[in-house]
Amino acid sequence: GMPEIQRIIIEQRSPMTAKDISRKYNQLTRPDWENRRVQIMRWALNGKLLYNWKTFGELLDSTGEKYIVEDSPKDTFWGAAKDGNIYSGVNALGRLLMQLRLQYRRLNKQKNIILKPPQIENFSFLGIPIPAILVDVTNEPYGANIHMW
């Protein structure tokens, strides 16, 4: 939903500016966001990996078997807050990145990978339903301004 707001946000050069603009529209967040946010973030991270296969994939792989933690004292759902030597929180982003690391290792020898949209009602971008996307992961770099729609 809200293609005009999505367009304003993606036109920003600064991620922080985009985030600040998005906060003005918090009341328009999808009603099912709390139940769908992990599914949507998984899809977004998969897209990030597929379009940055070598650089992002190698970065993930370089972490070995270490835990990945989003150090975030303010958001203990996506991250975890450090208290001394202990982190407490859900660390959903860190967990998703560790899953992505395994996926990268499993798929690393493939050339073409399909990114399927999550099975979510009204999952669209700029008013267009998000389709499955076939990505040639050997064709990097794509550039910072790739637009899939």
Give the label of every model feature segment.
Residues 1-149:
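Charged, low-complexity intrinsically disordered segments
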